[in-house]
């Protein structure tokens, strides 16, 4: 059996983790033997008083009132860790999501300080830039270029985007492009500030 992969995405109150923005949704989809399984992880999260920015509201269609009864990250952290532990996380613009998840782990006082201590990370944005230099490589543009269909992305959602990303990853690594993707798992997500990453998220 091949290594367990998890396509992963978050939605957040805004772009600036260093300014107190929080995760409001987590979505994850399991991939085994190059096929999506029915195993998924999805939850909305209460951002503990951090207001959702207008930009995030427009993108996600999530309002502050929608999250009043949602669990806190600390209440689901063990379930989340158990779902992803030991996997390779497939993330588009990984530095953004890794920064936010690590912040949530810190605030929850988790024993896991860095998600990369229990998972490896494959950044599809880095790979896409190698495959399609000089082109738009956000998830919308990339999935359209690779003819990923069957999804309504009028609004962003973490689980929806994780499903789209899983299909996109499988297409990217399907052998149709002459590129050694196994050697292109570039961990460059620390080179860009989250405030510069909006165009890569949309």
Indicate residue ranges for each PLM-predicted region.
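Acidic, divalent-metal-coordinating active-site segment for phosphoryl/phosphodiester hydrolysis
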Residues: 157-169
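Mixed-charge, glycine-rich, non-catalytic linkers/tails in nucleic-acid processing enzymes
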Residues: 174-188
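Short alpha-helix plus adjacent loop in nuclease-associated cores
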Residues: 121-134
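Hydrophobic alpha-helical segments, chiefly the membrane-spanning helices
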Residues: 200-202
């Amino acid at each position: 059996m091949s290594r367990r992969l998890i396509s992963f995405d978050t939605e957040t109150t805004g772009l600036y983790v260093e300014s107190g923005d929080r995760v409001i949704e987590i979505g994850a989809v399991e991939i085994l033997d190059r096929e999506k399984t029915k195993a998924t992880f999805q939850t909305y999260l209460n951002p503990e008083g951090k207001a959702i920015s207008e930009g995030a509201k427009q993108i996600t269609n999530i309002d502050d009132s929608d999250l009043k009864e949602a669990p806190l990250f600390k209440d689901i952290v063990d379930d989340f860790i158990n779902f992803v532990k030991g996997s390779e996380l497939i993330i588009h613009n990984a530095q953004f999501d890794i920064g936010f998840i690590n912040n949530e782990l810190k605030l929850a006082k988790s024993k896991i300080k860095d998600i990369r201590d229990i998972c490896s990370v494959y950044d599809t944005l880095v790979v896409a830039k190698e495959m399609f230099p000089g082109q738009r490589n956000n998830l919308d543009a990339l999935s359209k270029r690779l003819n990923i269909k069957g999804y309504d992305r009028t609004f962003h959602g973490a689980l929806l985007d994780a499903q789209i990303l899983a299909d996109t990853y499988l297409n990217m690594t399907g052998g149709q492009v002459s590129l050694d993707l196994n050697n292109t798992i570039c961990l460059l997500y620390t080179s860009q500030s989250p405030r510069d990453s909006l165009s890569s998220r949309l």
